[in-house]
């Protein structure tokens, strides 16, 4: 490479003719630049641009699908939350109804037990009063018979 540059710098243009005589260097470099630009555009940039465009479309499609899936997930979440709230309300109503029913059953059983105890107590009280009256009557007859016997003995 160094040798080539030395040769070019040491060479002299002798005489007329050649490219450098008409000063066409600048247009030639411009034509070379344009040809190289067209060649690079056809060979390198066009395939790169198509690949980039395909990748852009692929990403946009994936983003659209992802946003669609996200919106569906949000809809399902809202639907399930609403269903969960209604089920919770129904369960709460069921619990309160069951508590009311159990409370009523307990009150009924308590009333039945209270009536049974009241009846039993009344029966026992009546029975005791009857036994007391019977005992007092029998004691009264015994006392009267003893009084009669005492009088009989005293009168003798």
UniProtKB/Swiss-Prot annotation:
Its main location: plastid. It holds the Pfam family ATP-synt_B. The chain crosses the membrane at residues 24-44. It is found in: Plastid, Chloroplast thylakoid membrane. Keywords: ATP synthesis, ATP-binding, CF(0), Chloroplast, Hydrogen ion transport, Ion transport, Membrane, Nucleotide-binding, Plastid, Thylakoid, Transmembrane, Transmembrane helix, Transport. One of its GO terms (molecular function) is proton-transporting ATP synthase activity, rotational mechanism. GO terms for cellular component: chloroplast thylakoid membrane; proton-transporting ATP synthase complex. The keyword Nucleotide-binding applies. CDD domains: ATP-synt_Fo_b. It comes from the Eukaryota. Signal peptide: none annotated. InterPro entries: ATP_synth_b, ATP_synth_b/b'su_bac/chlpt, ATP_synthase_B_chain. Belongs to the ATPase B chain family. F-type ATPases have 2 components, F(1) - the catalytic core - and F(0) - the membrane proton channel. F(1) has five subunits: alpha(3), beta(3), gamma(1), delta(1), epsilon(1). F(0) has four main subunits: a(1), b(1), b'(1) and c(10-14). The alpha and beta chains form an alternating ring which encloses part of the gamma chain. F(1) is attached to F(0) by a central stalk formed by the gamma and epsilon chains, while a peripheral stalk is formed by the delta, b and b' chains. In plastids the F-type ATPase is also known as CF(1)CF(0). F(1)F(0) ATP synthase produces ATP from ADP in the presence of a proton or sodium gradient. F-type ATPases consist of two structural domains, F(1) containing the extramembraneous catalytic core and F(0) containing the membrane proton channel, linked together by a central stalk and a peripheral stalk. During catalysis, ATP synthesis in the catalytic domain of F(1) is coupled via a rotary mechanism of the central stalk subunits to proton translocation. Component of the F(0) channel, it forms part of the peripheral stalk, linking F(1) to F(0). The b'-subunit is a diverged and duplicated form of b found in plants and photosynthetic bacteria. This is ATP synthase subunit b', chloroplastic. It comes from Trieres chinensis (Marine centric diatom). The gene is atpF2.
């Amino acid at each position: 490479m160094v040798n080539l540059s030395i040769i070019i710098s040491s060479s002299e243009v002798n005489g007329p003719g050649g490219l450098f005589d008409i000063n066409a260097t600048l247009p030639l470099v411009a034509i070379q630049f344009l040809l190289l630009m067209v060649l690079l555009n056809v060979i390198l940039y066009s395939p790169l641009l198509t690949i980039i465009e395909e990748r852009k479309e692929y990403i946009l499609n994936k983003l659209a699908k992802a946003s669609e899936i996200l919106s569906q997930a949000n809809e399902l979440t809202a639907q399930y939350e609403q269903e969960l709230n209604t089920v919770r309300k129904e369960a709460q109503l069921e619990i309160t109804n069951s508590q009311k029913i159990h409370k009523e059953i307990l009150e009924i059983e308590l009333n039945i037990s209270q009536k049974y105890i009241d009846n039993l107590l009344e029966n026992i009280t009546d029975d005791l009063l009857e036994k007391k009256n019977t005992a007092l009557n029998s004691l009264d007859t015994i006392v009267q018979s003893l009084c009669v016997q005492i009088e009989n003995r005293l009168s003798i």
